[in-house]
């Protein structure tokens, strides 16, 4: 699954199912690739500033060949906690449930503060977590983080202290460890080297469904493995 959280600017999504959707700030686009989907993402206004967080969510083995799908979520649950404006992007948190469809136990929260803020967030003990600062600076679990910096937390925690001294925005992501090895190359996810090679061959030969909604972008060629041995 490709999960896009739009922060600034507008992007139009088009895909091989025929969807065409503009995503705006405060909205989520969720594309489930399943057995296969092609898509493009283009700026609505050329040269405009864009800022988004795009995350990939691995489907478990028993779900990964499901039918492809696309969702746009313009309305997400929001709660104020300790001066943070908390948006529940995925899963269940802070007494709210996101409408986004996911296939493993996980959670995603955007924490945005206009000024100084401090919160103690409850954690699920069997989840692993990561924090990512998007704008400003924040202290998470006692560690100071700058924009673009990640901090990982192993399972076992029950609470997490988050604070900022000025305006900031960060993501808190968590979930049960997947427990499966996956391979990633370019825009493809597979379980074996042979499966990855077959997907690359099909794409570069034009055997996969094209984007149907009139995207101006031409299909890109996937880089070949060229003797590379992938490891999960």
Short names for language-model regions:
Residues 1-232:
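Jelly-roll (double-stranded beta-helix
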